[in-house]
Swiss-Prot record:
Name the UniProt record assigns to this protein: Uridylate kinase
Entry-linked Gene3D superfamilies: Acetylglutamate kinase-like
Protein role: Catalyzes the reversible phosphorylation of UMP to UDP.
Pathway involvement of the protein, from the record: Pyrimidine metabolism; CTP biosynthesis via de novo pathway; UDP from UMP (UMPK route): step 1/1
Catalyses which reaction(s): UMP + ATP = UDP + ADP
Name of the gene: pyrH
Region (Involved in allosteric activation by GTP): 23-28
SUPFAM superfamilies the record matches: Carbamate kinase-like
Keywords tagged on the record: Allosteric enzyme, ATP-binding, Cytoplasm, Kinase, Nucleotide-binding, Pyrimidine biosynthesis, Transferase
PANTHER family registered for this protein in UniProt: URIDYLATE KINASE, URIDYLATE KINASE PUMPKIN, CHLOROPLASTIC
GO BP, sorted A to Z: 'de novo' CTP biosynthetic process; UDP biosynthetic process
Species per Swiss-Prot/TrEMBL record: Pectobacterium atrosepticum (strain SCRI 1043 / ATCC BAA-672)
Domain of life according to the entry: Bacteria
Higher taxonomy: Bacteria, Pseudomonadati, Pseudomonadota, Gammaproteobacteria, Enterobacterales
Amino acid sequence: MATNAKPVYQRILLKLSGEALQGTEGFGIDASILDRMAQEVKELVELGIQVGVVIGGGNLFRGAGLAKAGMNRVVGDHMGMLATVMNGLAMRDALHRAYVNARLMSAIPLNGVCDNYSWAEAISLLRNNRVVIFSAGTGNPFFTTDSAACLRGIEIEADVVLKATKVDGVYSADPVQDPSATMYETLTYQDVLERELKVMDLAAFTLARDHNLPIRVFNMNKPGALRRVVMGEKEGTLISQ
């Protein structure tokens, strides 16, 4: 298959799950995975692509279990936000070690640790080829980091949200439980809703749909997959109008 000489996207929002950073470990951050992801982001920057990043916090903290045990949901979500800041600090450090200029912004004030989120500042940094990592979700409880990814993607006018997962794309059923499940190359927003496919939570998904923000789901564990996506090669599942 012929490949494009130039990237098909100019500005992207990369959504990484916290679990992706833990690798085969059950908890925490796998340094080798972190460094590999930083190198893949570096490749995009070298291609001239402007990169925003949102990282989840599930590798460090999961509020759902504690909520069932009686913890207040708001408190649990605030703890989850802090977990995303910790992951953001790790990613910023990995990018700096890879000689990539990166800035970490938080939706909740953490002076002395990272910058407060500023839309105008984020746009300026992206235009100057700085990677911008958006942490602390939306800054509000009850919203997932997928919602934060779509919100920031819309705000920075990203061409696409690239949702990195552990599977190759969106399947008709869970491929682990159903070997006959087929992977979709393209879907419309309506297809996803009608078939009740699990791409991201409904609040996040409808936000993307209402603002016509395409979503591409792909497997970040496949070496080179991120580069293939931005070069327009056949990789993952694209969801659009």
